[in-house]
A protein has these predicted regions:
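C-terminal helical cap(s) of enzyme catalytic domains, especially alpha/beta-barrels
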Residues: 94-109, 270-284, 342-365
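Intrinsic, low-complexity polybasic segments
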Residues: 205, 209-213, 219-221, 225
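Active-site glycine- and acidic-residue-rich loops that bind
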Residues: 145-158, 184-185, 191, 232-253
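Glycine-rich phosphate-binding active-site loops on the catalytic face of alpha/beta enzymes
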Residues: 82-94, 175-177, 258-266, 318, ...
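Glycine/Thr-rich beta-alpha phosphate-binding loop at enzyme active sites
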Residues: 25, 29-30, 36-43, 178-191, ...
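A gly/proline- and charged-residue-enriched helix-loop-helix capping module
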Residues: 87-136
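An N-cap/entry alpha-helix motif that binds or orients negatively charged groups
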Residues: 3-49, 113-118, 122-123
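Catalytic cores of alpha/beta
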Residues: 69-78, 239-251, 308, 318-335
Length: 378
């Protein structure tokens, strides 16, 4: 049993969830936790993992939502995460929904949150990220400002995109949080295609400008150049199979780098936590172990429908190396975690990666890539 689980977690879990989260970020920012683990997070068993033009030290990233405002990126990377995704950030700074808005369900090893994209705004976060450490693959997750109606969503996303483009290694488009009114409407085919087409057009323009290449010289028929920022879309776990397949088709048409599967769920079936207690928590997205199978099923659908052509970052209910391995076999080539990190502590990334490397060897795989999609025949 780790020091975190026996000593630190009971203290943090005795506090209101968001207070504990803020305290944890402050501890991380001091470097104490990462200093303890530094030098103990070598993952040479994997070799480098190359996806959408980026090189990852290991497959496990930290999902958006933990470090919304990019205040502890280097310290989080030092804990052994192969990449860190900050945000969700919006063009307009916003306080999010009223507190309390983050709740623990220890019996289910889950969280319910209705944060509502509380963040300092894309401009402030982009300025902070200019100082990001070299070597840490950094994703920035962008969402729609609450005050902006869906009819003006494209321009709102474009403004955030332009601000974070110079500082992000990849950009994730969040259209799936259940905590911003009507946001999930943007997952519908016509709205999503319009949004992603506009972002990719701006992506090409910004990349060509930064590379000193004029659009006329670059040409319009070329596939994504290496200097374009990889663009991914983060989707909900509560979609039907046909809706997922439609998003896959759009993603392929718009030459997206991949899909992040999945965000939190609004479904609360089968929880161990008493129903009255859950009801009293109010609305919000559920994450953690209850989401695991649902997100794995979405990963499998994406992999099968795209015939393995569309990279998937699998997220939802990863607590153990076995959970991670299951998502790899379903079709994920990279992984993210959030709730598992909250429950397992500072050694979480190290433990998952070591366990995953061991599992791959035991199952006879020579590399992680060899295992991708093996349980989801195309």
């Amino acid at each position: 049993m780790s020091l975190y689980r026996t000593l630190i977690r009971p203290i943090l879990f005795s506090l209101p969830s968001e207070t504990a989260h803020e305290m944890g970020l402050k501890v991380l920012k001091t470097g104490l936790a990462s200093g303890f683990l530094r030098g103990k997070t070598s993952f040479t068993e994997f070799g480098k993992i190359e996806r959408f033009g980026l090189e990852f030290d290991n497959p496990l990233g930290l999902a958006a939502g933990f470090d919304k405002n990019a205040i502890a990126v280097d310290q989080l990377a030092a804990l052994g995460f192969g990449f860190v995704e900050v945000g969700t950030v919006t063009y307009h700074p916003q306080p999010g929904n009223p507190k309390p808005r983050l709740f623990r369900l220890p019996q289910d090893e889950a969280l319910i949150n209705r944060a509502g994209f509380n963040n300092d705004g894309a401009a402030a976060v982009a300025e902070r990220l200019k100082k990001k450490p070299p070597g840490c693959v950094l994703g920035v997750n962008i969402g729609k400002s609450k005050l902006v109606p869906n009819e003006q969503a494209v321009e709102d996303y474009l403004r955030s995109f332009e601000l974070v483009h110079p500082v992000a290694d990849y950009i994730a488009v969040n259209v799936s949080s259940p905590n911003t009114p009507n946001l999930r409407e943007l997952q519908k085919a016509d709205a999503l295609e319009e949004l992603l087409a506009a972002l990719q057009k701006r992506n090409r323009e910004l990349s060509e400008r930064s590379a000193g290449v004029s659009p006329a010289v670059a040409g319009a028929s070329r596939t994504r150049p290496v200097y374009e920022k990889p663009l991914l879309v983060k989707i909900a776990p509560d979609l039907t199979e046909s809706e997922i397949e439609a998003i896959v088709d759009i993603s392929l048409r718009q030459n997206l780098a991949g899909i992040i599967a999945t965000n939190t769920t609004t479904v609360r079936d089968g929880l161990k936590t008493p129903a009255r207690e859950v009801e009293n928590m109010g609305q919000g997205g559920l994450s953690g172990k209850p989401l695991s199978q649902r997100s794995t099923d979405v990963i499998s659908t994406i992999y099968r429908h795209s015939k393995g052509k569309l990279p998937v970052i699998g997220v939802g209910g990863i607590f153990t190396a076995e959970d991670a391995f299951e998502k790899i076999c379903a079709g994920a080539c990279l992984l993210q975690a959030y709730t598992g990190f909250i429950y397992q502590g500072f050694s979480f990334a190290r433990d998952i990666n070591r366990g995953l490397a061991l599992l791959l060897k035991q199952k006879g795989f020579n590399s992680l890539n060899d295992a991708v999609g093996t349980s989801s025949p195309r």
